[in-house]
C-alpha cells in the first residue's frame, strides 16, 4: 500500500467514526441498507447513530418509478460523493484507536449521506400566458438534448391575465380543456404561472384539488415570470421589486399551499430572474449579444416594450426551467446557446441563488 493510500485509509476510518450520519432523502426515492436495519423513506431525514467501532452498513439508493439514481451528492462532510454504487460505511476493526474513540464520543460530530435522483421524464401539463408559453414550448427540445427520454407535455395558453390559474378556472372553455387532460389520471407534473391581477391562492387551490383527485402523486410548480413594461422602471428598482415579490408573495404562498396539501410536492421556478440578470448585464455594458433593451428585430432582451421575451431571454429562461424541473447539471449540458455571454453559467447562478427550500424536493 502506498503512503497516499494509507493516509486516505486512516482519514476515512476517522471520518466514518462520526457519532451520527444524517441521511437526507428526496421525495423521488428511498435509502435502505443491505442488512435491512435502516430504511429511510422518501422525503425523510434519518439520523443514524454510529456508537461503536463495529458499525458496518451498506446504503443503497432506491429510485421511485419514473426516476433513476444518478449518484451520491458531493457535500461538505458527505460520504461517497460522486459515486453511483452502494455506499459502504464501515468502522469495524479499529478497536483501541484513541482518536477514533474520541470522535465516537463527540456528540457534535455529524456527517451526511444524500442520494441524487433524476426523473426519466414527466408527463406534464403547462398552463399560462405569453410570458410563460415560450419556455414551456422549449422543454421538449431541452429534455431530449439532456437525455431525458420520457418527457411528454400539453401546453394550454391564454394571453395576459387570462393565463393566471384562477382566470383559467373561471373560463369554462379553458377549464374543460385542462380538466380533460387531468382526467386521464397520468399527469406527473402540473406547472402554472403567476399574474399580479390574481395575487391570491384561490386558483391554485382549485387546480390542486382537481388534479390531486385524478392523480394524488401529481407534483405542482409555480413559475414566476418578470414584470411587464420593463422600460418604465429603472433597472435597480425593477430588480428590487421582482426579488421582493418573489420572497414576500410567491414563497409564502407556496408555504401556505404546502401546509394545506401535506405530502404534495409544490415548488417554484424563478425564471423571471433571467430577465433581471440580462437587464443588469445590459446596463453594465456586459451584454454584447444584444443592442437594445426592447426591439422587434431579434437583437434585444425583450421583443416589445410590453416585455415579451426575445430570443436570448427565452434561451436563458429555458435553461433555468431545465435545471429546476430536471436537475440537469448545466456545466456539462451538451448544448451551445450560441452567444458570447455564458447563459448556462448565468442560469446555474440563478438556481444557486434561489432559496433551496423552494426548489424541487425530488432532486
Q: Predicted regions: what is each one?
A:
Residues 36-66, 107:
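Extracellular modular ligand-binding repeats in secreted and cell-surface proteins
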Residues 23, 31-33, 59, 69-72, ...:
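Extracellular/surface recognition and adhesion modules
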Residues 179-311, 323, 332:
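Alpha-helical cap/lid subdomain in secreted, periplasmic
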